Amino acid sequence: MPLHNLTRFPRLEFIGAPTPLEYLPRFSDYLGREIFIKRDDVTPMAMGGNKLRKLEFLAADALREGADTLITAGAIQSNHVRQTAAVAAKLGLHCVALLENPIGTTAENYLTNGNRLLLDLFNTQIEMCDALTDPNAQLEELATRVEAQGFRPYVIPVGGSNALGALGYVESALEIAQQCEGAVNISSVVVASGSAGTHAGLAVGLEHLMPESELIGVTVSRSVVDQLPKVVNLQQAIAKELELTASAEILLWDDYFAPGYGVPNDEGMEAVKLLARLEGILLDPVYTGKAMAGLIDGISQKRCKDEGPILFIHTGGAPALFAYHPHV
């Protein structure tokens, strides 16, 4: 078992049973290709999402260190911050969130609805900044201030994307491999690639468990030149933690995130509407809509390695739909 070292790391059980891996019959008929979806949008806390897998490891480490406060950062509409705040509430911890407005909007829905509304329900302490130009340093500075107030803070990086958090997606690769075994031979796996932890964790896990499947990361905020080192560095850090090799090539598509992070585009919104109308499944304008736009275009452009079944990793994000009205 190449991933046996995963069990060495403390982990809280937030998710329980594996999330569904489903065939999408109407969407498959529409695209002329077998499409499956991994439903990490239905993880069981705070309207779901992929970050809960990372937080199982990160929150366990926070408790091990005796922390009473979780500190993290992201956009006003960050899914990661929302899920971190929910975990803090569940564990009886304080949560401080450092937020930016990356799209510079004054739209009331963006500033107050969606994920931002949920932060208030979770009693999150909000700190605003002009921009997360150096989030690691900014989080450390915030942690110093919080500690001076008598709290014991634990810093969770943007997206929960460090080697420890990304173990959640090595774990997910195990789930996927078990669900596919004897049922379907997946040719390509498509995932949104942003803070890179989900992508890198899957890269390490799938290399050892499903080596014949290609993993495609569709970038949501950066060009390949900027995103590749983030994914590779995390891939290697995860491999080091697990004492194994990671030599799989990182494949990225950067044609679908323009005009920029957090700004909806026509192709992404069309993908959101398409999956809603054909399968009753909700994507989001920031991550999964753009990743699905990549999948759709990738099929039409024959960018995938062959004509075999494709698995789409649904990382969640539907609460942001309410924040982006009337774009939706």
From Swiss-Prot:
InterPro entries noted in UniProt: ACCD_DCysDesulf, D-Cys_desShydrase, D_Cys_desulphydr_bac, TrpB-like_PALP, TrpB-like_PALP_sf
Q: Which family does it belong to?
A: Belongs to the ACC deaminase/D-cysteine desulfhydrase family.
Q: EC number(s)?
A: 4.4.1.15
Catalysed reactions, semicolon-separated: D-cysteine + H2O = hydrogen sulfide + pyruvate + NH4(+) + H(+)
What organism does the record attribute this protein to? Escherichia coli O17:K52:H18 (strain UMN026 / ExPEC)
Q: Does Lyase appear among the keywords?
A: yes
Q: Which residues carry this modification: N6-(pyridoxal phosphate)lysine?
A: 51
Query: Which Pfam family, giving just one, matches this sequence?
Result: PALP
Q: Name one GO biological process term.
A: D-amino acid metabolic process
Q: Which gene encodes it?
A: dcyD
Record's keyword terms, sorted: Lyase, Pyridoxal phosphate
Cofactor requirements of the protein:
pyridoxal 5'-phosphate
Q: PANTHER family annotated for this entry?
A: 1-AMINOCYCLOPROPANE-1-CARBOXYLATE DEAMINASE-RELATED (PTHR43780:SF2)
Q: Does Transcription show up as a keyword for this record? A: no
Q: Which SUPFAM superfamilies match?
A: Tryptophan synthase beta subunit-like PLP-dependent enzymes
User: Tell me, what does this protein do in biology?
Assistant: Catalyzes the alpha,beta-elimination reaction of D-cysteine and of several D-cysteine derivatives. It could be a defense mechanism against D-cysteine.
What name does this protein carry? D-cysteine desulfhydrase
The GO molecular function terms of this record are:
D-cysteine desulfhydrase activity
Q: Cite the record's note on assembly.
A: Homodimer.
Domain of life per record = Bacteria
